């Protein structure tokens, strides 16, 4: 796909109010067809931060180091209003708060998610060596790999994934390592940026870390993305790093990769929810 934008999108921007986003059918979530997918909420938070709080003149200097998205209410398939404000703007740190509201029948505007973004000013690493866990050595698929055709079962997927373990014959627990490539714009007519893409991939920490022999039976209440650099290229790799659960509460973490190596992590907390 060589065009500047994808044919399909998760949101249409309101014609009269640039803070209002109208979801398309592609944005529905896996738990309830009347609610939005978590990945589009985290993507929208990143879109807001980048659109209003990372000026073009400062993009080379500011690193989005953390994006936390608390999803404390189901997001209905209705118009979303996104607002943001600067909480702190210092010489080396900038903190942004994002609020996402939805129009709920008989209740009006209701806040359904809140996000906090921490932007840090880039400089140089201090001298010395620090221990880091070993990285995977799995090359991403080709940037020119064709997207699934209309007849392919993946053609209706809201992302394109390739598993490096697809040829392994031994039985494995589901969804441990994947390469993921976006197939939709977040906002119609706007090719998603690298930050928007990785904010959406970050939501994959839930199925990536919390799926097991019976599939996915945890629904995440948040996404917490950490980045020490921006991702490079179309493909982003997810590697399950941690899962722990007790009494129906779980924490799961994935490590994030691109063609140059590891660039961050994503962690979710989740509630047990059998399907």
Regions found by a protein language model. Name each.
Residues 1-275:
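Terminal targeting signals and extreme-terminal segments of soluble enzymes
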């Amino acid at each position: 796909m060589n065009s500047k934008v994808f044919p399909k999108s998760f949101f249409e921007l309101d014609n009269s109010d640039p803070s209002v986003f109208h979801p398309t059918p592609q944005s529905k979530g896996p738990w309830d067809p009347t609610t939005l997918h978590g990945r589009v909420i985290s993507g929208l938070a990143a879109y807001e931060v980048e659109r209003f709080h990372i000026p073009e003149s400062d993009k080379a200097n500011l690193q989005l180091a953390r994006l936390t998205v608390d999803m404390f209410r189901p997001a209905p398939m209705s118009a979303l209003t996104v607002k943001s404000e600067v909480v702190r703007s210092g010489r080396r740190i900038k903190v942004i708060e994002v609020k996402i509201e939805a129009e709920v029948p008989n209740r009006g505007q209701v806040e359904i998610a809140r996000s906090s973004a921490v932007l840090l000013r880039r400089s140089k690493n201090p001298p010395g060596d620090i221990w880091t866990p070993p990285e995977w050595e799995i090359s991403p698929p080709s940037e020119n790999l064709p997207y699934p055709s209309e007849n392919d079962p993946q053609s209706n997927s809201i992302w394109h994934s390739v598993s490096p373990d697809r040829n392994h014959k031994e039985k494995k627990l589901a969804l441990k390592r994947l390469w993921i490539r976006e197939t939709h714009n977040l906002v119609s007519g706007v090719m998603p940026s690298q930050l928007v893409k990785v904010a959406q991939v970050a939501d994959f920490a839930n199925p990536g870390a919390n799926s097991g022999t019976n599939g996915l039976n945890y629904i995440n209440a948040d996404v917490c993305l950490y980045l020490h650099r921006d991702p490079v290229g179309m493909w982003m790799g997810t590697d399950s790093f941690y899962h722990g659960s007790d009494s129906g509460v779980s924490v799961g973490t994935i490590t994030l990769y691109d063609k140059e190596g590891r660039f961050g992590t994503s962690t979710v907390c989740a509630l047990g929810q059998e399907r």
